[in-house]
A protein has these predicted regions:
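Divalent metal-dependent phosphate-bond-processing catalytic cores, especially two-metal-ion Mg2+/Mn2+ enzymes
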Residues: 14-133
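Acidic/histidine metal-binding catalytic segments
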Residues: 1-11
Length: 133
């Protein structure tokens, strides 16, 4: 059971179970999908909580919210884009009603991080111009 829990927790990084694990443990797939959907449910929360969650992610990665590095902003945007292009956020019927809210929030977060990248890019260009002779 500990192995099962560990595998499911690791899967939350990509929100996909490894095919070999699914073949070996098909009877646990429903539990794994439910766990991963519960992990993603934060994306369907109201904006204030969503912003708080996003700031927590920045801190988890050693960033100061509002002062994130270009690399972090780019990575965060790309992670969100990955969720967006993967299709529905939720795999289980228990969570599917939250999908439209989660998709809208992903769009909101992508807009936020795209804006941060634009601002940082302008700052980098300004610094580069002032540094050149």
């Amino acid at each position: 059971q500990v192995y099962l829990a560990a595998e499911i927790i690791v899967a939350t990084k990509t929100h996909k179970m490894h095919a070999a694990w699914v073949r070996a443990k098909p009877e646990h797939l429903a539990a794994a999908e439910l766990f991963m959907d519960a992990d993603m449910a934060i994306l369907a929360t109201p904006q204030p909580r969503l912003s708080e969650y996003d700031a927590q992610i920045s801190r988890e990665w050693g960033q100061t919210p509002g002062l994130e590095s270009f690399e972090f902003c780019s990575g965060r945007f790309n992670a969100l884009r990955g969720f967006k292009t993967a299709g529905p956020v939720f795999m289980t019927t228990e969570f599917q009603e939250l999908d439209s809210a989660a998709q809208a929030n992903i769009d909101h977060l992508m807009d936020f991080w795209q804006h941060r990248l634009t601002v940082l890019n302008r700052e980098l260009v300004t610094v580069a111009k002032t540094a050149s002779p």
